[in-house]
Amino acid sequence: MESPDLRPRDKSGFPGGLVRLDQDLVIIVPDLHARSQLLYSLTASFHPDHPSATVVELAHEGVCAIVCLGDVLHTEGAEGVRRWREAARNLVTGREGLLSAAMDQEMGASLHALLLVIFLKPALGKGFHCLKGNHDNLTNSSENGDLPFYKYAMEGSMGAAWFNARYGDGLGEEMRRYERSLALVAAGRDFCASHAEPLLPVNPAELLEYRSNPGLVRSLIWTGNGEAAEGSVEASLDALLGPGAGPRAWISGHRPVAGSFEYRAGRKLLQIHNPERTQVACLRQGRTKAGMIVELYKVGHPGSFLQRVDSACPG
């Protein structure tokens, strides 16, 4: 269980929905969507500022923190479209049914990514965090802020039925407890991050008691472009970081972007999820008050250096 200094407890003694980050270097991983290779390659890569240690070594030594924005399950992009549609055809035609090769491949990729996330948390402690996304809902629940979903096919219901058929009810209940334990927001010195843009202003007290507030959970994992209340990002930054004139930003995934990133909320929100790119965002906390710089890096093969491809100046 994480330290209360890192993740303050709620009234019942459980970890709350806010994670505090104090490392100088923070690496933010956009929506995984079954891309275990992206996360593995990142951990085995070298950051240009630290050429003598891999990212996983930096995280273990307390030099950096890796923050995943959730959505660990269900492939997206061109490969996701192909595989989900093939699995849906097999289900409808009855040729192979639910337990088809396409469905096994899809769920195998999702579970591979999930197991890597679950392994890294105890291995790296405060050096690794995974926030909750709307796809982190293996049983396709409509409770506790979650909603059933579909995109290319009936991913939610098909995935839940497959998991139950392969592993039974008991493991599904365990996975539900795990999903509900995920934090919603990570806060550094001059930035916050969540899966989706905050629908309404959020504050530390609300995040602390998130387990009993399904509306809050939904507002941080399901908000689409143009749905957030005006000023919600800035008010949330003030509440979580304290009022200040320095450059600050909220970083999110959820909605895909066409290039490296997109600004929203008057450049105070930075979206970084492009399912066709193997990219991460890197922040140096408190490096300068003249302006915030978020660097976007391409993740290559294990053992290579992260390659800087773009930079953003939100706030």
What is the predicted function of each stretch?
Residues 1-315:
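Feature recognizes metal-dependent phosphohydrolase scaffolds
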